[in-house]
Regions:
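Long amphipathic alpha-helical segments
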Residues: 1-88
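Active-site pocket-lining segments that scaffold enzyme catalytic pockets across diverse folds
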Residues: 91-99
C-alpha cells in the first residue's frame, strides 16, 4: 500500500476499528521511513510529518491513531544525528517498540 491508499481506505471506512486504523497508519509510516530517498535528516522528518498529517486527517476523531502518530513525529524530530541511516534506524526501532 501507500500513504495515500491507506488514507483513502481509512476515509472510506475500508479500514475500521481503532486498532486496525492505528496498525495500518503506523505500518505505512514505517514503510515510508525504510523507503525514503531523503538525503538529509531534516528532509526525512519533513516527509514523516507531512505523511502523518495526511493520515491523521483521514479520521480526525480517532485519538489512538493520532496519539501514536504524534509520538512518532515527536520522536523523529528528537533524534540527534547527521546521518540519515542512523535516523532511519532509530525511528524504525521506536516504531517496532510501539507496534
Amino acid at each position: 500500500m501507500s500513504i495515500e491508499q491507506t488514507y483513502k481506505d481509512i476515509k472510506s471506512l475500508k479500514i475500521q476499528g481503532a486498532s486496525n486504523i492505528s496498525d495500518s497508519a503506523i505500518k505505512e509510516i514505517k514503510i515510508l521511513v525504510k523507503n525514503s530517498t531523503a538525503k538529509k535528516p531534516h528532509l526525512l522528518t519533513e516527509e514523516i510529518e507531512s505523511s502523518i498529517e495526511r493520515l491523521k486527517s483521514a479520521r480526525p476523531t480517532e485519538p489512538e491513531t493520532e496519539n501514536y502518530l504524534n509520538y512518532i513525529n515527536y520522536f523523529s524530530k528528537r533524534v540527534v544525528t547527521q546521518k540519515i541511516s542512523e535516523l532511519k534506524k532509530e525511528i524504525i526501532k521506536e516504531i517496532n517498540n510501539i507496534e
